[in-house]
Amino acid sequence: MSSYLFTSESVSEGHPDKVADQISDAVLDAILVQDPRARVACETMVKTGVAIIAGEITTSAWVDLEALTRKVIVDIGYNSSDVGFDGATCGVLNLIGKQSPDINQGVDRKKAEEQGAGDQGLMFGYATNETDSYMPAAIHISHRLVEQQAKIRKKSNSLLPWLRPDAKAQITLRYEDGVASAIDAVVLSTQHDPGIKQKDLVEAVREEILKPVLPSKWLHKGTKFHINPTGKFVIGGPVGDCGLTGRKIIVDTYGGSARHGGGAFSGKDPSKVDRSASYAVRYVAKNVVAAGLADRCEVQVSYAIGVAEPISISVTTFGTGKIPDDKIEKLICQHFDLRPYGIIKMLDLIHPIYQPSASYGHFGRKPRELAYTNSNGERVVATAFSWEKIDKAEVLRADAKLE
């Protein structure tokens, strides 16, 4: 019997890098409400007392970036100098420019379906049947822990009123013969008000954050718990660390369980294949696993700037496939249009649906409807996390001729 440990981590919406991601995606969403054809590449940096918005945006929309940035910061919970950062009083510096016309000529086409990729690059999508979300268990649990921290923190009459926005979680799982069998270690660090005793903090975090989330079937006497192991975490958020858009790409994806092409997501409109193609191959891999064609599936796709058709598509199922990997690849090519325009149409991506994905993972989330009013005053209902649907599973299984 082979036995090994595997670890993944997540960070809360108050982590400085995630603050930056949420601002970048809030800018993208605000622009898409007014201008679906906008080209957006928005980067954010946050540090003590300041948020810097930079990047390249080509749009007919007008957005009050300063007010929007402040709102995101305050909504996260940085609303007072007492916590070290206040969205109402921090400086906001706007360094936005326009997208290069050299890129535009490679992306824009007379026929929409001929739209070229916004850049070269390689992207990976992954799915596994070890959780109901088709995500690796360690990253799934880590996300739920920091999500629970925020839920408890934001409750009116919270039982843990001393919680602050910045937090991190980490889960180490033991695998036996490739199957998750136990939680070996749990790490959770949460920012807090001064004055809370370590003993009281540890007990409260165990009861209100860990206990409701951790699967009891995987806990055992030997499970190690490290709760605020430094003993003090008062200084956090953008005061403790500089935050940058796109610096949590493993947290955003599969927690290290799958490969990563290197491109970040937040602040990028769907013409950027770093984002849209990564969503598409997650959609592909998840439907392959949901169809029962494999227990695990990783799909790689690559592009050349200005070229519509993918340069390559490859599939690996790590020996868990019920049919050969090359046959799964052929099924993918038959049922999924992985050209940039095809992806945008297939997943209905030109809507303001992105800010919710900027914290707690872009994958493994339940699709949900979001309503907004467009620039014509029309009410529009869009689907966030559309790439998490498994609506292709049935046809894939039928075409694979599995019983």
UniProtKB/Swiss-Prot annotation:
SUPFAM superfamilies: S-adenosylmethionine synthetase (SSF55973). K(+) binds at residue 43. The keyword Cytoplasm applies. It is found in: Cytoplasm. Its main location: cytoplasm. Its EC number is 2.5.1.6. The keyword tRNA processing does not apply. Binds 2 divalent ions per subunit. Binds 1 potassium ion per subunit. Mg(2+) binds at residue 17. Catalyzes the formation of S-adenosylmethionine (AdoMet) from methionine and ATP. The overall synthetic reaction is composed of two sequential steps, AdoMet formation and the subsequent tripolyphosphate hydrolysis which occurs prior to release of AdoMet from the enzyme. Homotetramer; dimer of dimers. This is S-adenosylmethionine synthase. It comes from Xylella fastidiosa (strain Temecula1 / ATCC 700964).
